[in-house]
Regions:
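Cell-wall polysaccharide-cleaving catalytic domain and substrate-binding groove, primarily
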Residues: 1-165
Length: 165
């Protein structure tokens, strides 16, 4: 069975709340997490939260600070989450990620790594997702499958977020 975040088109498992996200399904059947019409809308919401709410409003500029708020220790193994995202991105936990409009690739990598963590992908699936972020050895992009994240939806979600001004 696909992970909950992928089934809900919500790769970072954004909790339901007051926000009326663009692209929400009209019928929300998950009591805890938002359900989006497509992965693009789920990624848009994720990148909006990361680059606007967390970066601009909360002034959280590092993996450690973002994840400590995103996945607090009372609900998660926060330090393991931080270390895994750092390992996957190559960005040190306390290193500034950068300005989203200038360092887009770093923010996209953080989002992808968080989705890998949130959706409990195995080491092999993590490697597949990271390979597909660029391209596979045969030169073709790895598109959506049961053991991958749809990288094209991720990039369209980033674009939707940036278009909102």
């Amino acid at each position: 069975m696909l992970p909950r975040g992928i089934r809900n088109n919500n790769p970072l498992n954004i909790r339901r709340g007051k926000s009326q996200w663009q692209g929400l399904k009209a019928q929300q059947t998950d009591a805890s997490f938002c359900q989006f019409e497509s992965l693009e809308w789920g990624w848009r919401a994720a990148f909006y939260l990361l680059t606007r709410t967390y970066y601009i409003n909360y002034r959280l500029y590092t993996i450690r600070k973002i994840i400590s708020k995103w996945a607090p220790p009372n609900e998660n193994n926060t330090e393991a989450y931080i270390q895994n995202v750092s390992r996957l991105t190559g960005i040190a936990p306390d290193e500034t990620i950068g300005i989203p409009t200038i360092d887009a690739a770093r923010w996209i990598a953080v989002g992808l790594a968080m989705a890998i963590q949130e959706n409990g992908l195995s080491k092999r699936e993590q490697n597949d997702a990271c390979i597909s972020f660029a391209e596979r050895e045969d030169g073709r992009p790895k598109v959506n499958g049961p053991d991958s994240i749809d990288i094209f939806a991720l990039l369209r979600g980033w674009t939707l977020c940036r278009q909102d001004g």
